[in-house]
């Protein structure tokens, strides 16, 4: 992003909000409100029975419980894979021997700069979970096919989770598309 001018309106612990003067590709000059976020990573972790680890997590902003993949924000200078590995261990108490990329997505590109990196993790082993004090969730193991059906029928409403599940199922049907990392 290269604004003509940017005015910071808010700086929080995670996000920054600015009003940017920009020139669009069609030549129009306008002001846009932008929420700057460091980005994040989410993990579709599959066990040997092709079950996925899902968190049923309380989210204040959603006013209730939401099904989500283990995920978290990128720390400064932290590669997305390292974020994914850290979050999988902290939230689910898991490590994985094999990782592959499921690509990256925008959470809401009209307003947010956040890019979410999606990963598939396999050959899981137990580790010590260390969730943050403000994280309230339950860990559930759901067959991947059932999780995809839940994403398609609207039971799973979190975008990164729904798309991560569908991309993982697609990659497993056509594994040559994404190399292991």
What name fits each language-model region?
Residues 165:
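C-terminal boundary of histidine-terminating zinc-finger modules
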Residues 6-42, 48:
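Acidic, metal-coordinating catalytic segment for phosphate/diphosphate chemistry
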Residues 16-20, 65, 115-117, 138:
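Short beta-strand micro-motifs in enzyme catalytic cores
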């Amino acid at each position: 992003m290269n604004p003509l001018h940017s005015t910071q309106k808010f700086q929080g612990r995670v996000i920054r909000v600015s009003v940017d003067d920009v020139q669009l590709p069609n030549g129009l000059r306008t002001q846009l409100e932008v929420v700057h976020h460091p980005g994040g990573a989410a993990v579709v972790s599959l066990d040997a029975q092709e079950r996925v680890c899902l968190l049923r997590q309380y989210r204040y902003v959603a006013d209730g419980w939401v099904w989500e993949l283990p995920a978290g924000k990128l720390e400064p200078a932290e590669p997305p894979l390292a974020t994914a590995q850290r979050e999988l261990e902290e939230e689910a108490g898991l490590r994985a021997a094999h990782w592959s990329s499921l690509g990256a997505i925008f959470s809401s590109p009209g307003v947010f700069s956040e890019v979410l990196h999606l990963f598939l993790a396999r050959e899981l082993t137990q580790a010590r979970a260390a969730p943050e004090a403000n994280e309230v969730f339950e860990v559930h193991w759901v067959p991947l096919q059932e999780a995809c059906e839940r994403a398609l029928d609207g039971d799973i409403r979190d975008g990164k989770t729904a798309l991560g599940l569908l991309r993982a199922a697609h990659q497993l049907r056509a594994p040559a598309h994404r190399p292991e990392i």
